[in-house]
A protein has these predicted regions:
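Bacterial c-di-GMP phosphodiesterase EAL domain
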Residues: 1-99, 111-112, 212
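Generic, low-specificity signal for short hydrophobic/alpha-helical stretches with a mild N-terminal bias
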Residues: 3-4, 11, 122, 164, ...
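Residue-level signature of transmembrane alpha-helix interfaces in integral membrane proteins
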Residues: 32-35, 144, 202
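Charge-rich, low-complexity amphipathic helices
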Residues: 67, 146, 204-205
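Context-gated lysine
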Residues: 74, 134, 162, 205-206
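The catalytic core of metal-dependent phosphodiesterases that act on cyclic dinucleotides
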Residues: 89, 94-196
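C-terminal helical cap(s) of enzyme catalytic domains, especially alpha/beta-barrels
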Residues: 199-212
Length: 212
């Protein structure tokens, strides 16, 4: 996959998405342009990723709590990939690509208020795409726009308030303790690399400076 010319213009990073049963159920893939302003074909990118993460891959399925008034976020049945497109141009390209329902596209909360982004989010959701809201918007989203998001993403330093309409996922878990804390806080999945314990503090004595 990395030899594909399309990916030669991108920097890739990945982490595991883990559920409450401690099973790896999906992958979180971060894509960043190798150079600012690089033009990436979102449709071609999604097609390429679809070949790497096919329908037969492991799947995450969540049942969302309905919104007041009868609305509700779409389910994530069959989700295999959480896609974090770093950079405004790349995100726009991905949002405007044909929907791949098993891929969940992350959208930063501070961008959702932009009319072009909101329109792309609505169109992708209407086409069957899955979306995650990353962070907390400054103001409450309109119900129709909020319902486009199946999941809301947080990190330990800025945990989201409980009781929101979307299922919560925590990013950046780096240890089993981080993982347990995420689930204790009410998150349904966590993304990161929490395998193995963090290094133990050094017990070596500090060198004593010679007397003058």
């Amino acid at each position: 996959m990395l030899e594909h010319p399309l990916l030669a213009r991108l920097v890739l990073g990945y982490s595991a998405v883990i559920d409450r049963q401690r099973s790896v159920v999906a992958t979180r893939l971060t894509l960043a342009p190798e150079s600012p302003g690089a033009d990436v074909d979102g449709a071609a990118l999604m097609q390429l990723l679809g070949e790497v993460w096919p329908d037969t891959a492991g799947a995450l399925s969540l049942r969302m709590r309905p919104l007041e008034g009868g609305g509700g976020a779409k389910s994530t049945a069959g989700l295999t990939l959480m896609l974090n497109a770093a950079g405004e141009s790349l995100l726009h390209s991905v949002l405007n690509a044909p929907a791949v329902p098993r891929f969940m596209v992350e959208v930063p909360a501070f961008m959702v208020s932009e009319p072009l982004v909101a329109a792309s989010v609505q169109a992708l959701a209407d086409a069957g795409g899955s979306l995650a809201l990353k962070g907390q918007p400054r103001e409450a989203l309109p119900a129709a726009l909020s319902a486009c998001f199946a999941m809301q993403l947080e990190d330990a330093a800025s945990a989201l308030p409980k009781g929101g309409p979307q299922a919560r996922a925590r990013l950046g878990v780096r240890s089993p303790a981080d993982l347990e804390a995420a689930f204790a806080a009410g998150c349904v999945v966590a993304a990161g690399w929490p395998f193995g314990d963090p290094p133990a503090p050094s017990t070596a004595k500090k060198a004593v400076a010679p007397e003058l």
